[in-house]
Amino acid sequence: MENQEVVNQLAGFEVKVSGQPLSKLPEDLYIPPDALRVFLEAFEGPLDLLLYLIKKHNIDILDIPIAEITRQYMQFVDLMREMRIELAAEYLVMAAMLAEIKSRLLLPRPVVEEENEQDPRAELVRRLQEYERYKKAAYDLDQLPRVGRDTFIADAAVPPMNTAKIHPTAELPELLNALKDVLQRASLYNAHSIAREPLSIRERMSRILSLVDKENFIAFTRLFTVEEGRMGVVVTLIATLELIRQSVIELVQAEPFALIHIRAKG
């Protein structure tokens, strides 16, 4: 009887002994009740088990035969119990869910409710599809190169090098000649430092007023000179703004984007 159970469990699997296919167990084969069993499949949860059963039998995930899947699922649960393997509570919860879906599909339903009622398998299909996406993403991440598994950091110590230091030999006359040559080359480069004349904002204000008094109406650009550089631009601009603040001069413009002029205010 126990041998027959083993045969039933091997149904659907191709078993070979010494390279030859085995369709049935020898008649004189005795398998003790507590014989060693090797279970090769490992699942991360009930959804993983269901996905395995669906792929194993090439079942369309959108059209799951609940009765057949429930039967195979319960066979796995019973097998785990026979092998005294502790099952997580989530496996039993999934078994109850499958039984509920199976009963809802078998019970007759009114025509009105049948048109509006959602397929009892819809929630299970959604969870399976979502789990399959996460499982594929985890597999893709696992295939990425990983330090310590696929690549290893080289940790090779540099062998000690015992090399003798060779000190250069130089005589005093040679050093004096080298120093003389350096001094001669240094004398060829004479540096000249040129100090700029400091610019005064007060003086620039007086200069602007003098120009305005002479011509009464001058272009703003005439206040600046190229020779004074950026410092001259800054000083002239500050002086102009200070005179405008004191209401001594004003800026005028005939039209937008036209040339700006300065004239005395009043």
Swiss-Prot record:
InterPro entries named in the record: ScpA, ScpA-like_C
Keywords, ordered alphabetically: Cell cycle, Cell division, Chromosome partition, Cytoplasm
Pfam families with a match to the protein in the record: SMC_ScpA
Calcium in keyword set: no
Gene Ontology CC terms: cytoplasm
GO biological process per UniProt: cell division; chromosome segregation; DNA replication
Predominant location category: cytoplasm
Subcellular location: Cytoplasm
Complex formation: Component of a cohesin-like complex composed of ScpA, ScpB and the Smc homodimer, in which ScpA and ScpB bind to the head domain of Smc. The presence of the three proteins is required for the association of the complex with DNA.
Family: Belongs to the ScpA family.
Summary of the function given for this chain in its UniProt record: Participates in chromosomal partition during cell division. May act via the formation of a condensin-like complex containing Smc and ScpB that pull DNA away from mid-cell into both cell halves.
Protein name, UniProt field: Segregation and condensation protein A
Annotated source species: Coxiella burnetii (strain RSA 493 / Nine Mile phase I)
Encoding gene per record: scpA
